[in-house]
From Swiss-Prot:
Gene: hisP
Protein name: Histidine/lysine/arginine/ornithine transport ATP-binding protein HisP
Broadest EC class assigned to this enzyme: translocase
Domain ABC transporter: 6-252
Role summary: Part of the ABC transporter complex HisPMQJ involved in histidine transport. Is also part of the ABC transporter complex HisPMQ-ArgT involved in lysine/arginine/ornithine transport. Shows ATPase activity. Responsible for energy coupling to the transport system.
S-S bridge residues: none
Subcellular location: Cell inner membrane
Amino acid sequence: MSENKLNVIDLHKRYGEHEVLKGVSLQANAGDVISIIGSSGSGKSTFLRCINFLEKPSEGSIVVNGQTINLVRDKDGQLKVADKNQLRLLRTRLTMVFQHFNLWSHMTVLENVMEAPIQVLGLSKQEARERAVKYLAKVGIDERAQGKYPVHLSGGQQQRVSIARALAMEPEVLLFDEPTSALDPELVGEVLRIMQQLAEEGKTMVVVTHEMGFARHVSTHVIFLHQGKIEEEGAPEQLFGNPQSPRLQRFLKGSLK
């Protein structure tokens, strides 16, 4: 039986009276690639951001590597991680690749990837440098580009640096929030190829995506979110080959044109 890496149970998120997530659950075992698809506004990115507490969920529980995250209410009634050290640990185990790269503009490519291993993991500069060089090479960023600042890179290169930065933490699960949606069409393929390579190597990944080809051919499991709820989920061949929900049928018909 595969080792469970991430278990999200009955997650809710409310903004005042407006409920964005209405009880979403997800289980990722080692090597799983879970794609979350759905229309804009369905709650996909909010769900991902709640998993590592970039957004505070309103209800629910999260288990990472068998460890239940201890949650308490903040003054606004939302859930937060009770212990700052546990939050820090959580974010080393679940690392995020963002839609808009979120690289530090005042740091070189190499410094961007070294920063968190030094500040969060406590690696020496030499150890962090070796790790950064290794993962930058893995995503196809050569030594010449490593000394550049993000502004001098293409969008595809910046996103590959962002993936290297996430990998440098050597996390349990990689979270991808629409990693290709800010890219020019001709740059999408280079990022998807890296993600496919990571999947083939057995990395555990949760991916919010509009790339139906990736969801269909690389995922082990697909979740279709609609208005904050799971409308349908299952193996990709089931969801794409024989969708049961009329909403999913309509969504796929529009997406696969």
